């Protein structure tokens, strides 16, 4: 029986108001998690020693009861982390600032044109307004950038922009074009978003120049990734081009965390779908130990899941290290 689970990510809705080229949630997402279902989770979260709940989606601020959900969880002493596109953050900044201990905003361009090309909306200025508004209410957001062919040349400019808008931190990950299950995908997914062979030396040069020019931002953790981790992103894109192997992945995320989809399905992580017998809305703790989930975790531990070999967001933690870093304002290693 699973005894501890410090971190839970809850997809409160499948709906999304972005139109990202990297994701299909906006095309077909309809389901909202009910407040009643989330209320039934609380005894399991308490027994599992859960300390941090991340609200995600879809776009969590589209849920008509997002504030009630956050208040319910917070009333049980849980620390809350909001993962958002930022489109409606300015509108809800006051309540979000009061309810969430940390906020991460996805931002994939440093100008209106790039943002619109990737996110499908002319909303760049609105997102920056939301970041500034949240910071003014006491929770300076982190910014997360999905690097891809349309924006990788802006790598240093992202850091400058994050500083300018008052972000707490900025992190980077590669666009995931290798996993057919990621980000609500239902159709074949194009790999045209990835860097091409001719882009690789340009990206490498940017990382090399940033090591010197942004040395303090690396040292302070304002840039969450080290130069070495940015080079792993380069290696990932190089592997997609057939030039070398994918970077080795060390991850035990299913051992200290779980993801609950809006329909109640429990997943071992963001990128691997959960088994049919793992339903959090029935008994979350039992779902974690269902036959299907136990078999899936065993496959992951044994390295038999192809998705793990090309993962763009792996994590390795001990339970004690997760507990120590659960105060999110001091947890850059959790990529918030």
PLM ranges: what are they?
Residues 1-95, 102, 195, 203, ...:
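Conserved alpha-helical substructure of the radical SAM core
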Residues 2-4, 243-252, 259, 263-336:
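Flexible mid-to-C-terminal extensions adjoining Fe-S/redox cofactors in radical SAM and related proteins
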Residues 15, 19, 23-26, 254, ...:
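Cys/His-rich metal-chelating microdomains
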Residues 15, 30, 60, 87, ...:
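Residue-level marker for beta-strand->alpha-helix junctions and adjacent short loops that shape enzyme
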Residues 19, 23, 63, 92, ...:
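Residues that scaffold the ATP/ADP-binding catalytic core of kinase and kinase-like folds
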Residues 19, 49-51, 99, 139, ...:
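Short loop/turn motifs at secondary-structure junctions
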Residues 33, 99, 106-108, 113-252, ...:
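Radical SAM enzyme [4Fe-4S]-AdoMet core and its adjacent flexible, acidic
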């Amino acid at each position: 029986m699973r005894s501890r689970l410090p971190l839970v990510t809850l997809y409160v809705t499948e709906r999304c108001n972005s139109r990202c080229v990297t994701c299909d949630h906006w095309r077909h997402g309809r389901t909202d998690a009910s407040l009643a279902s989330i209320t039934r989770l609380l005894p399991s979260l308490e027994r599992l020693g859960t300390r941090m709940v991340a609200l995600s989606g879809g776009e969590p601020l589209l849920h008509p009861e997002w504030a009630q959900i956050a208040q319910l969880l917070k009333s049980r002493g849980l620390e809350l982390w909001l993962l958002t596109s930022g489109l409606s953050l300015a509108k809800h900044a006051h309540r979000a600032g009061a309810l969430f201990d940390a906020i991460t905003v996805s931002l994939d361009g440093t100008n209106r044109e790039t943002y619109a090309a990737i996110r499908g909306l002319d909303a760049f200025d609105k997102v920056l307004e939301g970041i500034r508004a949240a910071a003014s209410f006491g929770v300076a957001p982190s910014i997360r950038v999905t690097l891809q062919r349309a924006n990788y040349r802006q790598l240093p400019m992202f850091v400058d922009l994050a500083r300018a808008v008052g972000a707490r931190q900025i992190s980077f990950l590669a666009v995931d074009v290798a996993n057919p299950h990621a980000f609500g995908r239902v159709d074949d997914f194009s790999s045209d978003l990835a860097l091409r062979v001719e882009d690789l030396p340009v990206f490498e040069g940017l990382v090399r120049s940033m090591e010197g020019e942004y040395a303090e931002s690396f040292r302070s953790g304002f840039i969450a990734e080290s130069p070495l981790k940015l080079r792993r992103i380069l290696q990932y894109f190089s592997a997609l081009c057939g030039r070398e192997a994918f970077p080795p992945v060390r991850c035990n995320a299913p051992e200290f965390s779980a993801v609950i989809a809006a329909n109640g399905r429990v997943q071992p992580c963001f990128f691997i779908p959960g088994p049919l017998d793992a339903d959090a809305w029935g008994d979350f703790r039992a779902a974690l130990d269902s036959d299907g989930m136990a078999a899936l975790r065993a496959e992951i531990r044994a390295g038999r899941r192809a998705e793990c070999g090309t993962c763009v967001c792996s994590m390795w933690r001990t339970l004690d290290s997760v507990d120590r870093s659960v105060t999110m304002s001091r947890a850059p290693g959790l990529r918030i």
